[in-house]
């Protein structure tokens, strides 16, 4: 059996500033794949901790890293790229991720064009509607991480 190679990555489940009064989560549509909605995420640079990568990636991707960290998923969680996407990600078979549950402090600080844009648009949607909107190959990971945050009492909706 071949050993799979996964790119180290962080991902953020961003709750709206109104959480826990509302249960809305931030998702963004990739600029390179129309209709591909996901959480902000990105690679961990050499020598960088997952937390440092989280703050850097949020600033790069959504223009702000003004967040409150609510929880961190305790383990790496991996997913494979669909076979038709592997060519985009060099020699990796997929990504292994550290997930953070965060609350955004200010919606008006979001700026998808602050750096090189990775997303074309964003929205806050009800958490219960999330899996219908997300690309299929990420649904199982999202389901698992959200279930953990709920079970542990970090996510109350």
UniProtKB/Swiss-Prot annotation:
UniProt keyword terms in alphabetical order: Hydrolase
Recorded GO terms, molecular function? mRNA 5'-diphosphatase activity
Which domain of life does the UniProt lineage start with? Bacteria
**Short name of any one Pfam family annotated for the protein:** NUDIX
- Among the entry's GO cellular component annotations, what is one? cytoplasm
Q: Locate the Nudix hydrolase domain: which residues?
A: 5-147
What InterPro entries does the annotation carry? Answer: Nudix_hydrolase, NUDIX_hydrolase-like_dom_sf, NUDIX_hydrolase_CS, NUDIX_hydrolase_dom, RppH
Required co-factor(s) are: a divalent metal cation
Which EC number(s) are documented for this chain? 3.6.1.-
Q: Which GO terms describe its biological process?
A: mRNA catabolic process
The role this protein plays is: Accelerates the degradation of transcripts by removing pyrophosphate from the 5'-end of triphosphorylated RNA, leading to a more labile monophosphorylated state that can stimulate subsequent ribonuclease cleavage.
Q: Which PANTHER family match?
A: M7GPPPN-MRNA HYDROLASE
Q: Report what the protein is called.
A: RNA pyrophosphohydrolase
Q: Species name for this entry?
A: Helicobacter pylori (strain J99 / ATCC 700824)
Q: What is the lineage of its organism?
A: Bacteria, Pseudomonadati, Campylobacterota, Epsilonproteobacteria, Campylobacterales
């Amino acid at each position: 059996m071949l050993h799979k190679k996964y790119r180290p990555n962080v991902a953020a489940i961003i709750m709206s500033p109104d959480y826990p009064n509302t249960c809305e989560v931030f998702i963004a549509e990739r600029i390179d794949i129309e209709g591909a909605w996901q959480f902000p995420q990105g690679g961990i640079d050499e020598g960088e901790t997952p937390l440092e990568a989280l703050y850097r990636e949020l600033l790069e991707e959504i223009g702000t890293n003004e967040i409150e960290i609510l929880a961190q998923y305790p383990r790496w969680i991996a997913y494979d790229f669909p076979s038709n996407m592997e060519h985009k990600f060099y020699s990796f078979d997929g990504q292994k991720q550290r997930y953070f549950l965060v609350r955004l402090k200010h919606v008006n600080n979001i700026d998808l064009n602050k750096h090189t844009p990775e997303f074309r648009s964003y929205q806050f949607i009800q958490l219960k509607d999330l899996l219908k909107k997300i690309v299929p190959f990420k649904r199982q990971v999202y389901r698992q991480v959200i279930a953990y945050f709920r079970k542990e009492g970090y996510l109350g909706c």
